[in-house]
Amino acid sequence: MSVSLVVIRLELAEHSPVPAGFGFSAAAGEMSDEEIKKTTLASAVACLEGKSPGEKVAIIHQHLGRREMTDVIIETMKSNPDELKTTVEERKSSEASPTAQRSKDHSKECINAAPDSPSKQLPDQISFFSGNPSVEIVHGIMHLYKTNKMTSLKEDVRRSAMLCILTVPAAMTSHDLMKFVAPFNEVIEQMKIIRDSTPNQYMVLIKFRAQADADSFYMTCNGRQFNSIEDDVCQLVYVERAEVLKSEDGASLPVMDLTELPKCTVCLERMDESVNGILTTLCNHSFHSQCLQRWDDTTCPVCRYCQTPEPVEENKCFECGVQENLWICLICGHIGCGRYVSRHAYKHFEETQHTYAMQLTNHRVWDYAGDNYVHRLVASKTDGKIVQYECEGDTCQEEKIDALQLEYSYLLTSQLESQRIYWENKIVRIEKDTAEEINNMKTKFKETIEKCDNLEHKLNDLLKEKQSVERKCTQLNTKVAKLTNELKEEQEMNKCLRANQVLLQNKLKEEERVLKETCDQKDLQITEIQEQLRDVMFYLETQQKINHLPAETRQEIQEGQINIAMASASSPASSGGSGKLPSRKGRSKRGK
């Protein structure tokens, strides 16, 4: 269960005294008084900041509205008499300090001066205090706010050690109130009885020594009757903060996260939905539900706004639905609109020959045959003309009565006959239309049954086809899954083969390069070997030739010398012949 904590703000006039010990805050241990006041007046300071004095006064007056400051009586009752005595002395000293100081100074002057006479020894001014010392009277307005955030009633949640009894009947005296709270006298720290301009009731603030004591009092006394005779009950709320502010500080301006509780116009009590049910009317005025139940009128108690809508005519034309200028047939009860709207009443006369129709607004009867009003006209017995009939009581003649009865009988007979013919024809038409409609419905019913049968056959075929398609789809899904796995395997294998192919290509290129280098080396070696072989063959051939020469020639070759000229290239013919043999000789010589 959750409740809303309340904030009590006492807005004082400019020259009103400040009540002693009125301030209270449940969060006093968490925040200092300056921080609490700064937080409270934050929105008011923001609203009044940068405004001229005239604009500030206008804003304050606008929020104050028609509320007037009145005398607020605060009576304090403490459990300890010594504390009450100390408070009274503080009040006496604060209120009478200027007078007491002046009387003290004057008495000193009188003592220091020479006493000429006994009367000069007495002081001119003597300070005194009149009235009940525990009662304070201030001038202002009492504001009651509730927090927009709900607070739980669990034991581990911080609420407040101060409770407020919103409405105490004026017939209940202070002695009766003390009897009501007698079981909790030991845990009550102080009580403040607040009386403002609200008649026949007052408010009580009760401060306990601890929150647990306040919770116990709340659970015990909330919703409990003050006595067994009266119906008034104790309405308790937790007080989060009680503060005193001056009007020029913006005390009447709205407070952030708080909603001011209005007064019920009927009972003049504060309206709190957590305590009593609140009913808001169509004109946006709120009252206690019980108070509005006692209000016998259907209008709003404040503005006299009618809460229930006016009754609307339910009659309307049977053909077009118009609700104006309606006529009802006196024979069959058909309602139709007049000739100045859509003429449905006259069309009904043309169809049924029902002569008489009555206007619903003024109950005047119209005769369509005679084309005039007949609500006070009868036919004369002598000439049959229509004359106005006025009943004169006992002076009415029997002949006129007989004529009227006879004419009424004729009229009733003719109308009943025409009505019988009309309704018989209508019944025949209705039967004919009903028979045709029944035949049409039977035909449609047969067609619908055939369509349903065809649809059932189609549905069965489609279900079978669906089953076969589902089987095929299942098989295809299996194949697709298998092919997907094979595809993944082939892709992995292809990936591996590509990697191996790249490695083999690199190896092949390396082998080709090595082979090419080897071939080049072999070719070079072969070329060198061929040259060596050619030299060897040339040497052997030369040696053989030299061996076949005579000894003298061999001797000459051995002793011979080979001279290579510088210009051997320019004369190849001369050097070729002479150089060949020496070369051979040299070789043969080297061989030997």
Curated annotation (Swiss-Prot):
- Which Pfam families does the entry mention? BRAP2, zf-RING_2, zf-UBP
Q: List the Gene3D superfamilies hit by this protein, alphabetically.
A: Zinc/RING finger domain, C3HC4 (zinc finger)
Residue numbers spanned by region Disordered: 78-124, 565-592
> Which EC class does it fall in?
transferase
Q: So what EC number does this one have?
A: 2.3.2.27
Which proteins does it associate with, and in what oligomeric form? Interacts with the nuclear localization signal of BRCA1 and with the N-terminal of KSR1. The C-terminal portion of BCRA1 interacts with DDB1.
Where is it localised?
Cytoplasm
**What reaction does this enzyme carry out catalytically?**
S-ubiquitinyl-[E2 ubiquitin-conjugating enzyme]-L-cysteine + [acceptor protein]-L-lysine = [E2 ubiquitin-conjugating enzyme]-L-cysteine + N(6)-ubiquitinyl-[acceptor protein]-L-lysine
Residue spans with biased composition (Basic residues)? Answer: 582-592
Q: In which tissues is it expressed?
A: Expressed in breast epithelial cell lines.
Zinc finger (RING-type) stretch: 264-304
Encoding gene (name): BRAP
Which protein is depicted? BRCA1-associated protein
Q: Zn fingers (UBP-type): where?
A: 301-393
Q: Please give the InterPro entries that the UniProt record associates with this protein.
A: BRAP2/ETP1_RRM, BRAP2_RRM, RBD_domain_sf, RING-H2_BRAP2, Znf_RING, Znf_RING/FYVE/PHD, Znf_UBP
Superkingdom of the source species: Eukaryota
> What residues bind Zn(2+) 2, as annotated?
329, 332, 348, 354
What this protein is reported to do is described as: Negatively regulates MAP kinase activation by limiting the formation of Raf/MEK complexes probably by inactivation of the KSR1 scaffold protein. Also acts as a Ras responsive E3 ubiquitin ligase that, on activation of Ras, is modified by auto-polyubiquitination resulting in the release of inhibition of Raf/MEK complex formation. May also act as a cytoplasmic retention protein with a role in regulating nuclear transport.
> GO molecular-function annotation terms?
identical protein binding; nuclear localization sequence binding; nucleic acid binding; ubiquitin protein ligase activity; ubiquitin-protein transferase activity; zinc ion binding
